[in-house]
Amino acid sequence: MSAITRDEVAHLARLARLALPEDELDQLAAQLDVIISAVAKVQEVAKGDIPPTSHALPLTNVYRPDEVKPGLTPDQALAEAPAVEDGRFRVPQILGEEG
């Protein structure tokens, strides 16, 4: 017997604004039941003597200094552009066109 019912799946689908065909509700209920069972098994194993972690390996962020470095001049940036107009990249218009 599923821990989650067909009606609960339909309710969740409505909350998520998903249109689910009636014939998929039983299948999804069974799949969600498998997922819920797997999570329950993990909860059984993860008792209070095991500290919670967000990652299996202890990782720390390595930051580099935020230093200003020379970049391209506007002329260098536009040098290889296929089209330039008024000191800017010229690109085809895409908004407002009928497609």
Curated annotation (Swiss-Prot):
SUPFAM superfamilies reported for this sequence: Glu-tRNAGln amidotransferase C subunit (SSF141000)
Purpose: Allows the formation of correctly charged Asn-tRNA(Asn) or Gln-tRNA(Gln) through the transamidation of misacylated Asp-tRNA(Asn) or Glu-tRNA(Gln) in organisms which lack either or both of asparaginyl-tRNA or glutaminyl-tRNA synthetases. The reaction takes place in the presence of glutamine and ATP through an activated phospho-Asp-tRNA(Asn) or phospho-Glu-tRNA(Gln).
Gene (name only): gatC
PANTHER family associated with the record: GLUTAMYL-TRNA(GLN) AMIDOTRANSFERASE SUBUNIT C, MITOCHONDRIAL
Record's protein name: Aspartyl/glutamyl-tRNA(Asn/Gln) amidotransferase subunit C
GO biological process terms on file: glutaminyl-tRNAGln biosynthesis via transamidation; regulation of translational fidelity; translation
Top EC class of this enzyme: ligase
Keyword ATP-binding: yes
Catalytic activity: L-glutamyl-tRNA(Gln) + L-glutamine + ATP + H2O = L-glutaminyl-tRNA(Gln) + L-glutamate + ADP + phosphate + H(+); L-aspartyl-tRNA(Asn) + L-glutamine + ATP + H2O = L-asparaginyl-tRNA(Asn) + L-glutamate + ADP + phosphate + 2 H(+)
Taxonomic source organism: Thermobifida fusca (strain YX)
HAMAP family linked to this entry: GatC
